[in-house]
Amino acid sequence: MEERSGSFLPELPYTNRGVIRQKEELSALIDWCQITIKEVPLEAVIEDVLRIPMELMTVTGYEKGIAGHEVVAIFDNIKVLKPTGNAQYQGFQILMSGKGCRNYENFLQLNEETWFDFLNRVCQYHINVPRIDLAIDDRKPYLSIPDLIVRTKEGLLSTKLREIDFHDSGELKEEVFQSKGGSLYLGSSASNLRLVFYEKGYEQNKKYGTELDENWNRYELRFRQEMAVSVVQELLRYRDVAGLAMEVLNSKIRFLEKPTGSMTTRKRLYPTYQAWAELMKDIGKVKLTMQPQKKSLQKVWEWLEKYVAPSLKLFAEVGKIEKRDYIGNLVANGEMNITQKQLYDDYIKARRLEERG
């Protein structure tokens, strides 16, 4: 993708675009990593476990976290939390959302490591794994999410997961419904396994105003508690993310075709939906990939370009006529909020991180 003319972002470190298409039709990611480490001091969690230089982390005065935890140290979306209230134990929790995992891949690359190296190191400590997510990005795509939703409604799904939900937004064009971002949820949000199939390209477009990629689906496997612990053990044993994902998917769900020329109602005799069979066949070839990026500052810039730049251009032209620097005055009198100050601090730290590399 060509850079926008005049963009300063190619000169910034640590700001890889989140909209660059991957060459692979299928790729596998670790997309959430939440690990509790007991009886280890904060500095050791940061420098020995995460292997992030202490000076790059912001040690907070305790910020609200999740599930009885407070944030005590942070670098962008990589967070270290301390238990509070009923969750008391001696130790800390590492929390990396999807964005945090992409942030952390910068440090993995800097340390010439992989996710397997990190997980192996973590397992040398007394740990628990509240949650870990695996994600398959499908850019072919093999599946149509709206079609999966229709099949689910029609009962053409065999699954051991009891709770099913779906969301399909769209619009009518010439009396034909066209999807603009469908999602299918199998399993409850509190269960040890939840599968989520959704149109990632539409989600990114709605959230950030990025270029719409209609051919980008994401299939997430969200593991919690005992199953999350087992997943980490299996990842270290076989070092095969896609193989593990395929094994879980094959054991939990199967999308079906209505049999022709048969009156049977026994789903186990229904043939497998061809597109699902093709995905299961090819997903076993996928290797774990890393997509290191720090997208927060990039998103601000994209928002400025799309929504603010036209108005700035207007007042810049008016200023030329009136001999007034409207834009300069705006900048001089503006004040950053807490989030923007954090973005600036992260940017400064990112430059220092780049200098180390």
Mark where each language-model region is.
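Structured, helix-rich domain cores that form ligand/interaction pockets
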Residues: 1-295, 303-357
